[in-house]
Structure formats: C-alpha cells, structure tokens
Amino acid sequence: MARLMIFIMLILASGCSFSEDDAEENVVYVYNWGDYLDPATIEKFEEETGIAVIYDEYDTNESMYPRIAEGAVHYDVICPSDYMIQKMIDNDLLQPLDFDKLPTAKKYIGADFFEQSKTFDPENKYSVPYCWGTVGIMYNKNLVEEPVDSWKILWEEKYKNEILMQDSSRDALMIPLKLLGRSLNETDTEIIEKARDMLIAQKPLVQAYVVDEAKDKLISGEAALGVVFSGEALMITLENEDMEFAVPKEGTNFWIDSWVIAKDAENVDNAHKFIDFMCRPEIAVINFDHLGYSTPNIAVRDLEKDEEWKNSPVAFPDPEIYQNQETYKYLGNEMDRFYNRQWMRVKVE
C-alpha cells in the first residue's frame, strides 16, 4: 500500500497525470497512524469519488507533530490523539471543520464522544472522533499465575525480560504516575522525575520498548506481559486464546483519536469528503473489523456480524471500565519538552 501511494505521489509531482489545478481537485493527503484503517476503505473512497489518496503513516504523536509544525509536507487530513489535538489547536496548526460538509459524522458519531472531546477541543470545532480505547496490560495466562489488577506487576523481578513497555513519553510515564497516586497530566516536576526514576529502576526487567511490535511479540509468546492499547488487545486475544487484557485498578488513560484538517491543507473540500466517508457505518464497520479498536460510530455494533466481536468486553466495555479514567491533556510546550527529556533519560540510562 505504501509503495502504491509513493508511486502515485511521484506521478503527481512529475505532472504526468494531472495539471497543478487538477491535482488540487483530485487528491487528498492523509497522515495517519500505522495500520490504522483497512486499505479497502481507501480503495472504495477513490473509486466512488475519483479522489486519489496519498497516504503516509507515523508511529507516535510525537513523531507526527514536527512534520506538521515545520510544514515540510502539506498534509490535509491527520488523526492525532486527544492531547496532541489540543497542542495543535494551541499552536494554530489546525483549521475549524465545516460540519455542514460532515452530515454523516453528525448523524453517526455518538454525542457522548463529542462531549468527551471537549476536554481537548472545547468547542467541538476541530475534530471528529475516529477510534477510542484504554491502555492496559496484556498477559499470558500460562506464564502469569497471579491476578493482574495492578501496574505493580511490571516491576516484578520474576518477569525479567518478559515485559514489553510502550515507547512513548506520556504512555510510559503514565504508569508510574498512577502507581504514585497522581494524575497522568502531572505537572509537578519532582513527581515526574520520581516517576522517571521508577522507569529507570524497571529497565533491567524490560525486554523491549515497542509501539506496533507489541502485538506480534505477545501473540507469538515472546513476552508474558505487555502494555497495549485495547484495540490491540482484542486482536491479540483472537490470535492467542491464552492472552487476557486487564485495566489496572490504579487507573489508566481513556484516549480518543480523531480526524482533523491541517491549517495549511490545500485540499480542504476533499479532506471533508474523506472524513465524512470514514464516518459511514458500512465503512466504519470495515475499519472496526480490521483494527479491533472501539468505535464512536453508534451504528457499528448493530452492523457487526461476528458475535464474538459484537459481544467483546474489550471492544465494547462496561462503562464502569472507562467512566472514571483520565484523558491526556496538552500541558504546554515547556512541560511537553520536560516529559520528553525524562523519557530520553530512561532510554539512555
């Protein structure tokens, strides 16, 4: 898929297929997480609209942000997480959406999720929820004997070289902050440094700091415990029946990834068309089946044909699981840099 998109980009750049004006009318540049939608939905969009999708991927919010801020590539549609959307709004990197051009989004994206989005998009002007979930511990029942109900298990010596941690500053530091009884949006530098030191102390036990690799390692049995997103958890349990997912009692992150349009987008109408297309129930269910991530689309559960997925407590959890969880907030550029420095300290120690 990536090679196909690069090929299309080269054609556009060379002017072989489109004039400059035509390219603006017949293309949309999308920047999304790795493997975060079914390629078939892009093909359906292109076939129906005649708009070519130039698709690029990133692995973390932090790696995505500089490319947008520096303006090296002018993407149209992006899919950041909650706190990163707030940061992009604060730094004038997004443009308000025209919801008159998003009728499907207004009809099928649950009001509860727009309400939750107000924590990072206070007026619901900039974002349309795409996926949501929690962060928890995936564990192998055959390798882990005790109940998994606390983040503390990730510091157990007996699981040395069996633990996978997220390679992301906020997702990694969130865990010791919760063990300390603090908010995952902590701004007290001494507390954050204490959380950093806990991660440094844990480091000899960690097999790897990973992003997308966690799923394959856990499915294959290469690790006994891993910090994963709930959508990955559903896919892992389907591939390996020995795996289970737990949300620790200390609390965790309730996250929302949403579609936004970049401030310097050159294909704004096409960007709206792309977002609204992805909100169609019949398209959303294809992406749900591909990803396993919980969806804010209120029609998907009824359309889902797989009874195991439809009744999955991971994909459609009891509201008690996430009602009292926190959403990441953007804490300002200075605090953002501070978090990143502490995470780099962990990585280099």
Regions found by a protein language model. Give the residues of each.
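Periplasmic-binding protein-like
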Residues: 192-201, 207, 239-263
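A bilobed periplasmic-binding-protein/Venus flytrap-type ligand-binding module shared by bacterial periplasmic
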Residues: 136-143, 178-179, 255-267, 275, ...
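Early extracytoplasmic/lumenal segment of secretory-pathway proteins
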Residues: 18-88, 216
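Conserved C-terminal helix/tail region of periplasmic/extracytoplasmic solute-binding proteins
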Residues: 319-349
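A ligand-binding cleft/hinge motif common to bilobed small-molecule-binding domains
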Residues: 84-87, 219-220, 225-242
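Mature extracytoplasmic/periplasmic domains
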Residues: 262-323
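Short, low-complexity disordered leader/linker segments with a strong preference
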Residues: 1-27, 349
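Extracytoplasmic ligand-binding site segments that recognize negatively charged/polar headgroups
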Residues: 74, 79-205, 210-222
